[in-house]
């Protein structure tokens, strides 16, 4: 009977990404795993799925399969010669011939669990001053029923029926050399050489279960947007007794209504009147912890910037504080009473300025236009 197309076996199209292929394999292997599915033909289906994934998950093998299919090249290398072929799969083939397989990772060796990531949104104040927050996160934890063993309590393990305890299986592969036989880790026992007499009813043999876990996170004083902290050992459980992975909490900081932040420095925009700019003044302004009085010298112009040293954010690594910069904007009045206008005209005359007064009122401008003023 002819072999089915590997893409068809996994139920994905030929342009599927590696993640899509992996997701399809996990779903199907779980469905047809001999320890879970006792229906006739499930074992063969599981082998077919494993073989398809073994090829499509490897870039070189997938490229060879896409080019030659199941049969591989016939009658040598054809008109392309050696220069026109992709020999990316040779390393895998030769390693199986000359002992390269011994360098493969031991499937029974302890392995660290996967690292996880969690995004936490915090306020500007929480980032500046630091705080403690509780989060809820769904993650894999060690199964409480089997304690991570994967077997039903009270049952034992037996020799894997798929690899007969070898931990590895022989698989035929299509390559540019034709069909070659190589070894791979047994997909059923994952190299242990044993299988469950009866899998754990809670985790179905995985050794882990998905639960919502509450954790307390310390937000460091001075943390900035996109920075992260590591919670050691709060990731996924390890494999074969390996350590847990870590949890990385990434911070998203909401903007402040008062300040703008750039690293450890903060900026405050201060509007002052024409009189304050011309005569100078003392103005109370906010800082991160309290209000302070800022002296505005006479003749201050728009764009003037004042620096308040060490009034910025504390550096998250403990390297001092940033600065507070105050940006000045002189605001021109939009409405003047008659007395204010008289004073400004007098001021202009003293300066020798010939002012052609303009009105912001449409009716006044219209009257002046028709009078020819």
Curated annotation (Swiss-Prot):
One of its GO terms (molecular function) is ATP binding. The gene is dnaJ. GO terms for biological process: chaperone cofactor-dependent protein refolding; DNA replication; protein refolding; response to heat. Its main location: cytoplasm. Binds 2 Zn(2+) ions per monomer. The J domain is necessary and sufficient to stimulate DnaK ATPase activity. Zinc center 1 plays an important role in the autonomous, DnaK-independent chaperone activity of DnaJ. Zinc center 2 is essential for interaction with DnaK and for DnaJ activity. This is Chaperone protein DnaJ. Zn(2+) 1 binds at residues 143, 146, 200, 203. Homodimer. InterPro entries: DnaJ (IPR012724), DnaJ_C (IPR002939), DnaJ_domain (IPR001623), DnaJ_domain_CS (IPR018253), HSP40/DnaJ_pept-bd (IPR008971), HSP_DnaJ_Cys-rich_dom (IPR001305), HSP_DnaJ_Cys-rich_dom_sf (IPR036410), J_dom_sf (IPR036869). It comes from Staphylococcus epidermidis (strain ATCC 12228 / FDA PCI 1200). Residues 5-69 form the J domain. A zinc finger (CR-type) spans 130-212. Participates actively in the response to hyperosmotic and heat shock by preventing the aggregation of stress-denatured proteins and by disaggregating proteins, also in an autonomous, DnaK-independent fashion. Unfolded proteins bind initially to DnaJ; upon interaction with the DnaJ-bound protein, DnaK hydrolyzes its bound ATP, resulting in the formation of a stable complex. GrpE releases ADP from DnaK; ATP binding to DnaK triggers the release of the substrate protein, thus completing the reaction cycle. Keywords: Chaperone, Cytoplasm, DNA replication, Metal-binding, Repeat, Stress response, Zinc, Zinc-finger. Zn(2+) 2 binds at residues 160, 163, 186, 189. NCBIfam families: DnaJ_bact, PRK10767.1, PRK14276.1, PRK14280.1.
